[in-house]
Amino acid sequence: GGCSSEWGFSEGSQPLGIFRPVVLEATDEIRIEPFGVHIWNDEKAANVFVETEVKNYGKTTETIEVVNKLSNADGKQVFRLVEKVTLAPGEMKVIRQQSPVENPVLWDTENPYLYKLASMIKRDTKTTDEISTPFGIRTISWPVKRNDEDGRFYLNGKPVFINGVCEYEHQFGQSHAFSREQVAARVKQIRAAGFNAFRDAHQPHHLDYQKYWDEEGVLFWTQLSAHVWYDTPEFRENFKKLLRQWVKERRNSPSVVIWGLQNESTLPREFAQECSEIIREMDPTARTMRIITTCNGGEGTDWNVIQNWSGTYGGDVTKYGKELSQKNQLLNGE
């Protein structure tokens, strides 16, 4: 929270410095950019789209091949897309490719089926860079994107009851400095409790979480921020910079079904609308499938989701079930 009106360490503060593992990788001078592979499917699960960011860090113009190969869980090739690209020194290009897919196995909470996309750069037939991206084909539908009276959430055309949990990424004595083993332990606890959905309250968690949610079939409501707002040009630009990084790191995950822009939002409507449009530009499925939310306050997104604390911060726990059946509580953030 810094010097803002943010209340409480658990809600808004994030540590500074290095608090997660860091890896140094040596690459070829022409490489796929970090988080530079974007893969998604359309709302009919009939076509797959791939974008690959490649950049030439060398001093000479080079011609390469960009190859994207999708394989099923058994390793059988589904499609292979190839495009020749010429890059001047310092030049970055986004390579856009697409392919139909016939009778795909769909990712869901009961069978979280994952394909694998291998993205490669080839120079003189030699593979000089390669990135592997797990990918699940699925469709989702929210009531706020439909013009009907049905208040249910649909996954692959079937209604799914969302039974989720929020988690603060804090470890006693370690703050946010989770090891991979500690993330895995949290995941096991959440699954053992019977939850099928997760909200990372209220800032982006360790990326290993979404890896597990993809593999375990857990629906993911990812969060960017909580409460904070400064009406300065510097804050606006930095917020949008962090927003783009957040989306880029998470948009390939089939488990992600909600983009949570801010918890108990203090963002002005027009700024939230601007941020929502950035999300939709970076993630086309946010126009047709995924939703963008604030929670317990806020304007400018697809849905301001209510929070209900009956029996905790106040209210009557015996009325909780009845309250959740109300139309304005189809989805509840806490």
Question: Language model features by range: what are they?
Answer:
Residues 175, 184-190, 196-334:
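Substrate-binding/catalytic cleft of secreted carbohydrate-active enzymes
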